[in-house]
Amino acid sequence: MAKEIERDEQGHPLYGVSVQIAALLVITMQYVQSFVTPALSTVKGAYASIGVSDTMIANIQGIPSLMAIFGAILVGVLERYMKKKTILIIALVLMFAGSLAGLCPETEMGFYLLLASRVMLGLGRGMIFPMASSFIADLFFGKRQARLMSWKTAVGGLSGSLFQIIGGLLAVMSWRYAFIGMLMWVPVAILCVAWLKEPEVAKAGGVDESGKKGNALKSITPFAWAMFVIFGIWNIFQFVYITNTSLLVKAYGLGESDIAGYIMSLETAMSAVAALAYPLWRGRVGGFDMAVAILLEAIGYTIIVTSGTNPTMFVVGTVFYGFGFG
């Protein structure tokens, strides 16, 4: 007989430490692609002899970000037909399929196969992004939910920092190792799926009280649509940092893939610090929390692009950018 789940006074389930850990581990799956980020300059060198341009090399990071949009949309569709954990498993399979890029030959066809693997990774990553929050929102309630939401960003930032350091060290040996290194997190993914619980569903998504399916898009105001567009554009600028830092570090003569890994891990580490510090100053800037975050990112971005070959200013810009991003 299955053990009965303990519940609070409102009837909400009270899950233990293992489920909480699993829910937090979901966000780390989104950052697995950070293994590859520092290797961008190394990949560029590997494919330069066959005429692959810098723009095409940048697509190695850009394509996953683009496909992540479609992956996030796909989650909303699949939730109507299958369980949340099943969707998570599909997302993980797609994402770890991205490690196959490490097996691609250094030919023109091999490069396009590499990009195809990045399409799969992007879809998986995009599917994981909303699920990292929804598992916490669906499984936990009250103060525990708020606490886990805060920890989620910190855990993601710390894991991304670790992955970038490891990826940079692997890329020094071979760019292929950076891609294959993603598989190091497979045991954690298996543990995450095993410990997670399927959220209790009171009502099917998209169904109102009368049992009829509604159109969620009709409830979105023009102002909300405008915000979607504005923040979509801002996200494009954010990913410029992610996709070009490795190339910029090498172009400025600051170092190779390992140095790029350390610098980018600093950004994700600062994101984690910002996430942990946010509750301390939340609401203390007159509701302009998001504006302050964007301003910090803009300051950091400006310092980075104007730092030239000054490594100290590059690091300072990274700190500002990372804190704003977090």
Features from the language model and the residues they span:
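Extracytoplasmic gate region of multi-pass secondary transporters
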Residues: 37, 223-271
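Extracellular/periplasmic helix-loop-helix junction of adjacent transmembrane segments
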Residues: 39-70
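Conserved MFS/SLC helix-loop-helix module at the cytosolic interface between two early adjacent transmembrane helices
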Residues: 70-109
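C-terminal transmembrane helical hairpin of 12-TM major facilitator-type secondary transporters
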Residues: 287-326
